[in-house]
Curated annotation (Swiss-Prot):
Predominant localisation class: plastid
Alphabetical UniProt keywords: Chloroplast, mRNA processing, mRNA splicing, Plastid, Ribonucleoprotein, Transit peptide
Protein name: Chloroplastic group IIB intron splicing facilitator CRS2-B, chloroplastic
GO biological process, one term: RNA splicing
Domain of life, source organism: Eukaryota
Assembly with partners or alone: Part of large ribonucleo-protein complexes that include group IIB introns and either CAF1 or CAF2.
Keyword Protein transport included in the entry's annotation: no
Endpoints of the signal sequence: none
Annotated Gene3D superfamilies: Peptidyl-tRNA hydrolase
PROSITE patterns in UniProt: PEPT_TRNA_HYDROL_1, PEPT_TRNA_HYDROL_2
Known role: Required for the splicing of group IIB introns in chloroplasts.
Compartments it resides in: Plastid, Chloroplast stroma
Length: 240
């Protein structure tokens, strides 16, 4: 288990080997029954992963909204995404006092689990604190859904992640609706298509709303606030 202890100037994730440093907290392996206050469990870090494809050609496509959510979180929380580890672009920071590790796997969507499994193991993040963020065709464009667990839902990225987490599904996930392909449009072509101006506006609003939901989850868990968030999202485009 990882646990952070407060220091005035720096914090860093420490597991099998040192990685790199940021400000405000020190995250280290915990011990039981010790007398040293530095090893007191205060906060459990979160691994927050956005799924997508690397490279400029995929930027702004429907399949990459998970990456875009990570970009919004990094901007809002002042996290620098400047390190490559476990085939992922990562950044370490905090939401208030809770340490977070943001990650964008660079393996391409269908192999995302290679990065997630490695990072979760290296930093010893418990399953309940691995938040997966990805696109969802079963939801209307711009509609969000935050759940404590679920299946793969025919999403190859989520399928890969579950495969590298020993088939376990009890990790939270934030789904970002992108709608369904119109008519007989090929699904792959739809996923790699950029949004229309109206759709893009809906996605940008969803990313802002989603970032606040992630903050609520990290600080308070799945409370009534998350339930209200899901209810509002479900009916956000319904006209009375």
């Amino acid at each position: 288990m990882l646990c952070p202890t407060y220091t005035p100037s720096v914090y860093h994730f420490q597991t099998q080997k040192p990685v790199f440093r940021k400000q405000r907290f020190r995250v280290c392996s915990s011990t039981s029954g010790g007398e040293d206050d530095r090893f007191k469990v205060e906060y459990t870090p979160w691994l927050i992963v956005g799924l997508g494809n690397p490279g400029n050609k995929y930027h702004g496509t429907r399949h990459n909204v998970g990456f875009e959510m990570i970009d919004v979180l990094a901007r809002k929380e002042g996290v620098l995404m400047n390190t490559i580890q476990s085939k992922a672009l990562i950044g370490i920071g905090a939401i208030e006092d809770v340490p977070i590790l943001l990650a964008k796997p660079q393996t391409y969507m269908n192999f995302s689990g290679e990065s997630v499994g490695s990072l979760a193991s290296h930093y010893r993040v418990p399953l309940r604190h691995i938040l997966m963020i990805y696109d969802e065709m079963a939801l209307p464009n711009g509609v969000l859904r935050l759940q404590p667990k679920g299946g793969q839902g025919y999403h190859n990225g989520v399928k890969s992640v579950m495969g590298h987490l020993d088939g376990r599904r009890n990790f939270p996930r934030l789904s970002i609706g992108i709608g369904k392909p119109p008519g007989n449009m090929d699904m792959k072509a739809f996923l790699l298509q950029k949004f229309s101006p109206l759709e893009q506006k809906q996605i940008e609003e969803a990313l802002e709303q989603g970032s606040e939901a992630v903050k609520t989850l990290v600080l308070n868990g799945f409370n009534q606030g998350i339930s209200r968030f899901n209810l509002v999202q479900k009916y956000k485009f319904h006209k009375v």
